């Protein structure tokens, strides 16, 4: 544990940020899972709607550095391909 006042403050801030980022990361994963679930049901309209809800959230968090930009691009690319492959 830190002894210096500023180090204690930084530890508190770091823990606070960690919890905030964990909840945001969980939210992003949930939106991605909703798209996969819609694809699994075979409903193309629902899958497209879930994708359009997910896309700006993934982009925003990739821009802020919560997830890597390549990971965001990979998710969007894979999901788009799966949605387009649906009948």
From Swiss-Prot:
Which terms are listed as keywords in the entry?
Ribonucleoprotein, Ribosomal protein, RNA-binding, rRNA-binding
**Cellular component per GO?**
cytosol; small ribosomal subunit
Q: Which SUPFAM superfamilies does the UniProt entry name for this protein?
A: Ribosomal protein S20
| Region spans: Disordered | 1-26
**UniProt-recorded Gene Ontology molecular function terms:** small ribosomal subunit rRNA binding; structural constituent of ribosome
Q: Which Pfam families match?
A: Ribosomal_S20p
The biological processes this protein is annotated with in GO are: translation
Q: Which family does it belong to?
A: Belongs to the bacterial ribosomal protein bS20 family.
Job description of the protein: Binds directly to 16S ribosomal RNA.
Q: List the protein's name.
A: Small ribosomal subunit protein bS20
Q: Which organism is it from?
A: Photorhabdus laumondii subsp. laumondii (strain DSM 15139 / CIP 105565 / TT01)
């Amino acid at each position: 544990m830190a002894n210096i006042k500023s180090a204690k403050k930084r530890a508190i801030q770091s823990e606070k940020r960690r919890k905030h980022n964990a909840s945001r990361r969980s939210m992003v994963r949930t939106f991605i899972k909703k798209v996969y679930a819609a694809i699994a049901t075979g409903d193309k309209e629902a899958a497209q709607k879930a994708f359009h809800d997910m896309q700006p959230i993934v982009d925003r968090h990739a821009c802020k550095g919560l997830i890597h930009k390549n990971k965001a691009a990979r998710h969007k690319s894979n999901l788009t391909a799966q949605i387009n492959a649906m009948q």
